[in-house]
C-alpha cells in the first residue's frame, strides 16, 4: 500500500499550532483522515481515557466526542465505550461512524 503522512516538529515553544482546517487543506482527496490532538477543534473525536489518568475527561461536556476508548468501564459515558486494547473494535466503529463499512467489507 502507498501512504503519505504530514508531520511537523515545533522548533520553538512559542510557535503557534496551526488550525486543523489549514492542515487538511494540504491533503488531497481522502476517504478518511485520522487526527491526533486538536481536541478543541470542532470535529468528531474518540477520547482515550486510561485507568489512573489524572486528566479530566472531555466527553462529559464535549458533544463532539462520539465515543470513548477506555481500559475500564464507564457506565455514565452516554456514548459508546470501546475497549482501548481491541483495535479491531475501534476500527469497526470508525468505519461505521464514517459510513465506510460498506467500502471495506
Language model: regions and residue ranges:
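Short, Lys/Arg-enriched charge-dense amphipathic segments
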Residues: 23-29, 55-70
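Conserved C-terminal guanine-recognition region of P-loop GTPase G domains, centered on the G4
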Residues: 40-61
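ATP-dependent carboxylate-amine ligase catalytic core
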Residues: 1-46, 80, 91, 101-105
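Conserved NTP phosphate-binding and transfer environment spanning the P-loop NTPase/kinase superfamily
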Residues: 61-105
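Short, hydrophobic beta-strand segments that form beta-sheet elements in well-ordered domains
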Residues: 33-35, 46-50, 64-71
Amino acid at each position: 500500500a502507498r501512504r503519505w503522512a504530514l508531520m511537523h516538529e515545533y522548533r520553538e515553544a512559542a510557535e503557534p499550532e496551526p488550525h486543523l482546517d489549514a492542515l487538511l487543506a494540504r491533503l488531497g482527496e481522502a476517504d478518511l483522515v485520522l487526527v491526533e490532538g486538536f481536541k478543541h477543534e470542532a470535529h468528531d473525536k474518540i477520547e482515550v481515557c486510561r485507568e489512573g489518568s489524572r486528566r479530566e475527561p472531555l466527553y462529559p461536556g464535549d458533544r463532539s466526542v462520539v465515543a470513548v476508548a477506555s481500559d475500564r468501564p464507564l457506565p455514565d459515558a452516554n456514548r459508546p465505550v470501546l475497549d482501548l486494547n481491541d483495535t479491531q473494535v475501534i476500527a469497526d466503529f470508525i468505519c461505521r461512524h464514517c459510513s465506510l463499512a460498506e467500502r471495506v467489507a
